């Protein structure tokens, strides 16, 4: 399965006809938040593949343009607190990050983040019984605690995500939120059976499932 994952930064060539020259044969797109909805719509319109997304803390509740208002990328599938099936893949997600101000969108307290994760648990347990595995791809905006995160509260990782990774062992965990400015920054870390990937900007990955 070949995946284009995006987050946090608009990449000029992905928002131009050049996308068709540089991105080939992807099966789906994963968006990890803090991206304009129109940008995500453009990508799936050009590539003609499904897009699965979560929102980030800088995403608007409503986005406006000449075509009216949108509350999500049209044609995309929201993964927040949901388990979704695409062909033989099992995906689930959690949006947002740690709450750092009262008025911010898509921010959660520690307790709320645990509840977001626990909302996924019943169906993941059923999947384990039915399919022998609970989850293939976990999609979030924030990182797990201590993995690709930063010391400030806004960018600190989410402990509930570490628990989900340990208990349900998805093959991959895609996240964004933490910007990457240095070439030597670690963006992929194996945690038990899960490869955690910071997809800041974009990545194209051939997944082994």
Regions picked out by a protein language model, each given a short descriptive name:
Residues 10-14, 35-41, 57-64, 98-104, ...:
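Active-site environment of divalent metal-dependent phosphoester hydrolases
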Residues 23-24, 44-48, 71-73, 131, ...:
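Short, conserved loop/helix-junction motifs that constitute active-site signature segments
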Residues 5-7, 28-34, 51-57, 79, ...:
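Active-site neighborhood of phospho(di)ester-bond hydrolases with catalytic His/Asp-centered motifs
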Residues 1-45, 126, 130-134:
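N-terminal active-site segment of His-dependent metallophosphoesterases
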Residues 83-87, 162-168, 180-209:
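Binuclear metal-dependent phosphoesterase catalytic core
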Residues 5-13, 55, 59-61, 66-156:
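Conserved catalytic scaffold of divalent metal-dependent phosphoesterases
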